[in-house]
């Protein structure tokens, strides 16, 4: 079954809108899913075509200097991680859909100028985190994951599989593009908000790929520590931890073999 489930409130509707549309974003591959899984088991970044290149290195050298460019790569190489590991799957195997329609299909939601339109955005993808915006319109977030929230106006938002975000927009022009680009910037889903069928607005170019930072990589660790009161006393075997700098450049990954996992309380 493919679709969204909208549950109306038991009492009066608290969010005023003249028109209401559901926009369900998803992704699809024509490959055998088990073949996709087998590829990822062999090589986790099989579908990542945004790997750092020699041209990126020379660009960083010209902008930041040789030392900074080398240090930037040294850190990631020592961790044996990719700074562009943003998604397991990319447009190399996925098609990004809006209400089951490809970007070329131009699914359209209708409105009349001056109406308050509620767009119920649903991420029904199996893999993709989407960054959503509507060029030319502000998005007022009013409802998140089944709960009304204090309205906040944004230009763009990111949501992952299983999340829902409702926004209010007040369009004035004839057509707007609902643009949802994948977090790894390899593709996008799009729909159109228009006064009649057949119209479309310009589709933005994909944003440049941004490297992950240490805050991205360490965020999960810090959340896990605060939420579960993780004890570090059992990690004495990690001799490399003693010399770990803020950039983790000096981290001795070879010493992790002596890590006493039994002493870690979760």
Task: List the predicted regions and their residue ranges.
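Histidine-centered copper-binding motifs that mark active-site loops
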Residues: 1-133, 137-159, 167-168, 197-249, ...
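Ligand-binding face of N-terminal immunoglobulin V-set domains in extracellular IgSF glycoproteins
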Residues: 162
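Ser/Thr/Pro-rich, low-complexity mucin-like regions
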Residues: 129, 173-174
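Terminal connector regions
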Residues: 174-205
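Short, hydrophobic beta-strand segments
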Residues: 165-173
């Amino acid at each position: 079954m493919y679709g969204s489930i909208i549950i109306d409130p038991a009492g009066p509707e608290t969010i005023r809108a003249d028109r209401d549309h559901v926009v369900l974003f998803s992704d699809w591959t024509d490959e055998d899913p088990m073949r996709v899984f087998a590829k990822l088991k062999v090589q986790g970044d099989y579908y990542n075509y945004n790997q750092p290149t020699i041209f990126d290195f020379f660009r960083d050298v010209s902008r930041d200097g040789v030392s900074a460019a080398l240090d930037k790569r040294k850190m990631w190489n020592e961790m044996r991680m990719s700074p562009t590991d943003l998604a397991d799957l990319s447009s190399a195997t996925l098609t990004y859909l809006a209400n089951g329609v490809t970007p070329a299909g131009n699914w359209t939601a209708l409105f009349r100028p001056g109406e308050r339109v509620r767009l119920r955005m649903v991420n029904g993808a199996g893999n993709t985190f989407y960054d959503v915006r509507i060029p030319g319109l502000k998005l007022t977030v009013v409802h998140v994951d089944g709960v009304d929230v204090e309205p906040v106006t944004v230009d763009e938002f990111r949501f992952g599989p299983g999340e829902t975000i409702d926004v209010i927009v007040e369009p004035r022009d004839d057509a707007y593009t609902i643009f949802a680009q994948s977090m790894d910037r390899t593709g996008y889903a799009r729909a159109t908000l228009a006064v009649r069928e057949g119209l479309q607005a310009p589709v933005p170019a994909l944003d440049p790929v941004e490297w992950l930072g240490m805050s991205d990589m360490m965020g999960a660790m810090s959340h896990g520590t605060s939420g579960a009161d993780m004890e570090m006393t059992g990690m004495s075997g990690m001799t490399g931890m003693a010399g770990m700098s803020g950039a983790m450049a000096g981290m001795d990954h070879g010493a992790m073999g002596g890590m006493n996992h039994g002493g870690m309380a979760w």
